[in-house]
Amino acid sequence: RTYEDTENFNKFSGNHWYVDKGFKHFWLYISLDGVGQQAEYMRTGLDYARLMSNTRKFLAETKYTTVSFINTFNILSIPSLKSWLQMILDLRVEFGGRNQTEFEIAPEPTEHEKEHGIEHKKYFQKKFQRIFLDIPLLKYPNWFDPQNATPTLIATIEDCLEFMRSNAQQEDYRETFEGFKPHEILKLERNLAIIKEGKDPAAVQTNRLQFYQYINEYDRRRDTAFLEVFPEMNSYYNECKLLQMRIDDAKET
């Protein structure tokens, strides 16, 4: 249904017609592969603080809405993965069942409906999960494939998996909607298992060399500083750099 609200809707636009709820649910998908400066490095133009502010505003000012964070899991996602998971937990508390109110919707009948005795079916809005996550594994470009990860980076993922397990949903989940669901934990378990399978050593060397070349060119073109943003990857970067140095030395001899 529509109605005119000249005080609160499009006050200065000249168009005051407001369309009331015409859908049962709206699902907003957000691509976010990390947090803070690392997330901004991976997606040029992203303002992380503004994104989170807008996300909270969207959740606070709308009903019948859900947000799903998509972390296209690549090697650059690893350092901030635990912080990313903590962000999910925090939002699930902030907008979870403890802060939701169940209510009944009974649309007002039109004059025509009143005349013909037509009654709308009442709808009862129950509490529901508003924050979802997904962590699909990136396979291309090859140099960002997490299967190129070193044992140190793999250990970081293992630590994050334990973090998820220690924050798994509890018996009151249907009331609070807090914690991680079993299938969400299985997603990271699956990713970790695939990453541990590894790749052919020659392919890993090629991918790491291309990683070094790509990052250097990326920083040059966009005036960024990889090691300042990803200090946790200093060792990995230097391993990749060593491959380039060997090639350069071979050319000189």
Show which residues each predicted segment covers.
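Charged, low-complexity, helix-prone segments enriched in Lys/Glu/Asp/Gln
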Residues: 29-31, 70, 156, 160, ...
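Generic preference for hydrophobic/aromatic residues in regular secondary structure cores
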Residues: 26, 65, 105, 111-122, ...
